[in-house]
Amino acid sequence: SFRSMYLGLSAFLSANKDRRDLLLSQRQPEFDVSFDPRIAVAPDDFSRITLKAQAAKDYFLLVGPPGTGKTSRALRGMVEAFYREGKQILLLSYTNRAVDEICKTLSAITPEIDFIRIGSELSCDIPFRSHLIENVLESCSSRREVHACIERCRVFVGTVSTFSSKTELFRLKTFDVAIVDEAT
């Protein structure tokens, strides 16, 4: 929407010079080199990908053709690693179908990772409707309980469009990591 584009432009223009330079490719993204020895001896590609994502100080891009395990294996590994570190994680995709795939991946993780899906029942697969924010919060009887529930949950999932129109969530929650799946 116009409002979300306007807010995005405003955020970009009010960002510090270093951030603007990064976004305009005027400087390279930075990585924590202390991960290099572990990356070098990682047992497989997906372990290496997870470690490289953890080493990223700015952003990490994973590009590959469909069906190569980017969502089912790489995203899962990243979520598990960041979750173990106590990070607040935002998972986004451009379509509700892709968001449901992320939810399916999250549901397969053991021990179970609690997550909240932002969206509507009409666009959410039945197995994941119990994770919709309105269903998670329906037992809350006060604002304090709502805030505590949102604070307690460390993984939020939804479409880019839904999150860009629900900016009030960002006043309640700060995320350490954002992963955008299928960001073509």
Placement of each model-derived feature along the sequence:
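Generic beta-strand/beta-sheet core signal
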Residues: 63, 92-94, 158, 178
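Conserved nucleotide-binding/hydrolysis micro-motifs of P-loop NTPases
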Residues: 96-99, 122-124, 162-164, 184
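Pre-ATPase regulatory/linker segments immediately N-terminal to the P-loop/RecA-like helicase/translocase core
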Residues: 1-51, 55, 107, 112, ...
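Pre-Walker A (Motif I) flank of P-loop NTPase domains
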Residues: 56-62, 86-88
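Conserved RecA-like ASCE P-loop NTPase motor core of nucleic-acid helicases/translocases
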Residues: 66-68, 73-74, 78-107, 114-119
